[in-house]
Amino acid sequence: MLIIPVLLVFVLLFIVYNRVRLPVNVNSLINEIKKEELPEFVTGKTGFANNNDIKIAYEILDSKKPNGETIVLINGLGQSRLVWPTYFYQPFLDQGYNIIIFDNRGLGESDWIMDWTKENSYSLEDMATDAIAVLDALNITQAHFVGMSMGGMISQRIAISYPTRILTLTSVMSAGFYGDPDLVSVSKTFYANIIGVTLLYASKLKTDAQKMKFDLSKQRLLKGKGDYKIDNKKILQKAYYEIIKRKGFNSKVSDQHSLAIKISGSRYEELKNIKTPSMVIHGINDPLIKIEHAKKYATLIPNAKTLFIKGMGHDLPEKYIPDIFKSILKIITLNSTN
């Protein structure tokens, strides 16, 4: 009988703890953003691909000096294509690569799966076909793929199932089997923090401010103990942009994407057969997908290169981009069709 009261106290403590994780000026920041003219976060040519009657919204960022090759960036769980910072992809544009970003099914301007149930769910394989549908819609035969978190898992699946469509694979802060019982899972503190944030904000996404705070809270948690600052205002601006200029936030998409990861299971055996030149990048301080995941699945992909970054959490801080860019550019250049 004591279990429920103890759990309630536990959750309440973390709710209080998470309240102080947001910057003290968060409310004034939100009010400021609502009064200002928002930056434009959709700057490329946009369109829709069709995958079995599911519309996938994409955006093409063209290089001013195109070299004829394309890089596809695939975002993670519950993240729209706006998650990619300009400072990440601009160096590739400067090198002549066109960039494609798209909203995974269930969020952004792509179709939201309204008839989704646990019995009628979709997998990472299905999400991989969304990426292929985007290539088909644009008449692109092959591309370099860079995926972060769940996007890395989808990119792995593309290398496994569609090897003729992928030139190189870069899997960032990802895993080959997130449910691996032999590896270190997320800490109880981090898990409790996620629950606390969800109870505080996601359970009542009724106001713009709540939605913006939820998005910022997640980003601050994913940073972990990384020795760098995040741009609170930019994160809040993007969240508000999603609300007023796009379709807003789908409260069900995290459950959908989480189940897609779960039912897709392990790719360990299949990774051993990948012939695509591959790179595994991971933050040593990642609080969500521990570095042990990267160290394990990287050894399974034949000849995979690795870059493990001390201090980086589960995000893409600007201070580490020069090293990340150099590593990805090297593998892409060595395996160019030109």
List each model region and its residues.
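Alpha/beta-hydrolase
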Residues: 192, 196-197, 205-269
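Short beta-strand/loop motif that positions the catalytic acidic residue
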Residues: 274, 280-282
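Conserved HGGG/HGGXW glycine-rich cap/lid loop of the alpha/beta-hydrolase fold
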Residues: 54-112
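Catalytic active-site module of serine/aspartate enzymes centered on a nucleophile-bearing elbow/loop
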Residues: 304-338
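Conserved hydrolase catalytic core segment
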Residues: 141-183
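Active-site loop/oxyanion-hole signature of alpha/beta-hydrolase fold enzymes
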Residues: 107-146
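Acidic catalytic loop of the alpha/beta-hydrolase fold
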Residues: 285-289
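Flexible "cap/lid" loop of the alpha/beta hydrolase fold
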Residues: 169-205
